[in-house]
Amino acid sequence: MAKAVGIDLGTTNSVIAVMEGGRPEVIVNAEGGRTTPSVVAYKGDEILVGQIARRQAALNPAATLFEVKRFIGRRWDEVKEEAARSPFTVKEGPSGSVRIEVNGKDLAPEQVSAEVLRKLVSDASAKLGNKITDAVITVPAYFDNSQREATRQAGEIAGLNVLRVINEPTAAALAYGLERKGNETVLVFDLGGGTFDVTILELGDGVFEVKSTAGDTHLGGADFDYRIVDWLAGEFQKEHNFDLRKDKQALQRLIEAAEKAKIDLSNASETSISLPFITFDPETRTPMHLERSLSRAKFEELTADLLRRVRQPVEQALSDAKLSAGDINEVILVGGSTRIPAVKRIVQDLVGKTPNESVNPDEAVALGAAVQAGIIQGDSSLGDIVLVDVTPLTLGVEVKGGMIAPMITRNTTVPAKKTEIYTTAENNQPGVEINVLQGERPMAADNKSLGRFKLEGIPPMPAGRAQIEVTFDIDANGILHVTAKEKTSGKESSITIENTTTLDKTDVERMVQEAEQNAAADKQRKEKVEKRNNLDSLRVQAVQQLEEQEGAAQDAKDRLKAAADEAEEAVRSEDDSKIADAQKKLEEELRSFMTANQASTQGQPEGTQAQANKADDDVIDADFKPAE
């Protein structure tokens, strides 16, 4: 049976891991990397994913998609500001959803994320020697129901059976606590590329119990990058009266340079940013260059408000868990953005202790997801591990006056089920519309509507007489199911809160088929490249033989050279039939050449080789002074 894997589907980078010998291990990708950039590029009919997509981004900014996790499961009115700063086109889709336009085609964020998942799983399957079908995928703890469901759908589009969707900080705690003994209260501080979570857990005797979670799904490393982008663009505009952010290619280069500068400033007090030929003067068409120095102090000044936003979720998580900073035994840092020195200082200041850096912030989440996958599959090496997680946001229904009536409050342990009785507001009311909400505000309009459904056929009766039983049921993935039943008549209606990103079952099935078709095309392209590379390697071998065997018969050398030249032409043509013919011919000529040469060598008089060896013995190694 193929093992299930754990996947950290990140904003900036993604990681895949598996249980091996009782320990979670990261699976390297085809390029040998432990992390894979969450970047997808569309180049003609070809889809590039990972490092290869990232490398060509500056030349193909409109069709190179990154940080798509910031749009997954979101509605257009939630992401308009973030969409405006992307080098690619993000726009409103059906029913207020988000779509990304590439080469005239509209893509759902789930489709793009599915390409990253497919790359991870394909590479891992090749490494493990088994096709992977089952996975645990992580999400930020503060992801709402829509975002969780959209992530699960991305896995489905990628051809995966998603065993569980679990919270990233909880997964990191699993990786941290797997081999630790004794009881601890741990605060996981997870600042990734696009999201921020704080989770407090109690660990002990194989039980991982989440006490509280808080966060901000609009805060991450990319926000720090864009502060540098805006500063660089502003400085350039002052000097040249031209806004680089209006040039997609220049904007892509700015984003890449900003990320590099941010990383440099984690280890240096100052860094240089050099972008030659960043654009051209619109009037004279002469090239323009950008050269700037950025100090760590200036970077902290540019991001001061972002750094302040880091504090509140930590304080809220402590308050919700009814703990003080002194009750925390360890602080675990997760996510690449926790390497920012100012972030580390804030954490230390808030909790009063130096963070534990024993876990790799880039890999801990995937490792923990692999542990969860092992638990689900019954991996005996893990023993009796129990994971108790919570729902991050309050769930409720809209009631008279536009208020929200909470059903399941935030930080309730999941799975969870709650039933409440509601009634009608008017005499002889034939039905009710139930608006399912998620959020912490008292008014329904200020919270996120997850879905609406109707319960009809209520018998005529005075206002307040009908008894409508509403049940909220959250599963282990944090996905919500709601039912409503009128007790007198027995009429019942229900809704599973999914399809909140306007991807219905038909959409998902179509995308799965497209993904499978792409997979077949990708396989064909890979096989074609391998055949071309094999022929080219054989050609190089033939050329080496010609150089090494100068004394071979001239007609044999001529035939081999002609076959090698034909192979070189076939490689350049990319014509499958030419490549196959050239491969066959070159193999035959090379085999014939080497056989003839070997026979010639064996047929030499015995003394010839001995004399050659004697001549070698007479050679004296010496260092000669070069001629003046």
UniProtKB/Swiss-Prot annotation:
Record-linked InterPro entries: ATPase_NBD (IPR043129), Chaperone_DnaK (IPR012725), Heat_shock_70_CS (IPR018181), HSP70_peptide-bd_sf (IPR029047), Hsp_70_fam (IPR013126)
Disulfide bonds listed in the record: none
Taxonomic superkingdom: Bacteria
Methyltransferase recorded as keyword: no
Gene Ontology MF annotations: ATP binding; ATP hydrolysis activity; ATP-dependent protein folding chaperone; heat shock protein binding; protein folding chaperone; unfolded protein binding
Positions of region (Disordered): 547-628
Xref: HAMAP family: DnaK
Family per record: Belongs to the heat shock protein 70 family.
Name this polypeptide is given: Chaperone protein DnaK
Source organism: Deinococcus radiodurans (strain ATCC 13939 / DSM 20539 / JCM 16871 / CCUG 27074 / LMG 4051 / NBRC 15346 / NCIMB 9279 / VKM B-1422 / R1)
